[in-house]
Amino acid sequence: LEATFGNVAGLAFTESTELIFSRSNYLMYGNNQSVSNINTFGFSQKMGESSVLALSIMSMGFGEIDITTENIPEGGIGTYSPSLTNIGVSYAKEFSNSIYGGVTLRLISEKIYNLNSSGACFDAGIQYVTGSSDHIRFGVSLKNIGSRMLYGGDGLSFRGNAEEGDYFLTISQRSNDFELPSLLNIGLSYDLPMLTEDHRVSTSGTFTSNSFQKDQFRLGLEYAFRELVMLRGGYVYQEEVTNSSYEATMSGLCAGLSVELPMGSSKFGIDYSYRDSKVFQGTHSIGVRIDL
């Protein structure tokens, strides 16, 4: 189900029914404070022998922020709470033993005080699995391909003095539309040969072409013991990342841990991950999964 974020084609590997919930403290600072809290929920269901349908919801909140104006810059006149919400519907299919594909339609809503914007986009991906034991995987995905977005609302209007005459006018401003940050991912993973099936070591690499920032390279390593405990580590490299004037906020090291707890024919999983950041104290994420 997590594949709906990276490469939706991976959703086709869902065996039955899966539920997931996660919470991320994005860019920690101070005393356990964060710039934003991100809550995600997902549900996937296998349909027939080769198709999977999924629903995903992401809500990003920034807490309460003091309202300030030119005349009252110190605040004290109320607060507002910006929010971003994405709702996606995904479909993935197993075309053969080697080829998997999927697509996601996503609705986007952004609100900042008395301004709001909405739009729609889609993601698409394909995966190719090969090797004597399906130990080589290649994937390509496109994300955030959609319409331009535009902010509107009462926040674009204000009361001003007329140039001639002793009265006020309501003045409306126009906002400029903007593109979504589309990107292209090309990835490859390889399972190293092991002496026993109790252990698995997988390596992966991904190239990301971003529309509004420099391209990125990602390297990952995962160790699994009996597919019950998984340890992961990774590194995100970006051109000129060693120059503090150009480095991205989210680059460098990352790590994660997953534990699968069998419950009869079902599984209960716990996930944790940490991503390093250059300015703040990193991003912590924790999630739970249920496979029915």
Show which residues each predicted segment covers.
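Subset of outer-membrane beta-barrel
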Residues: 1-292
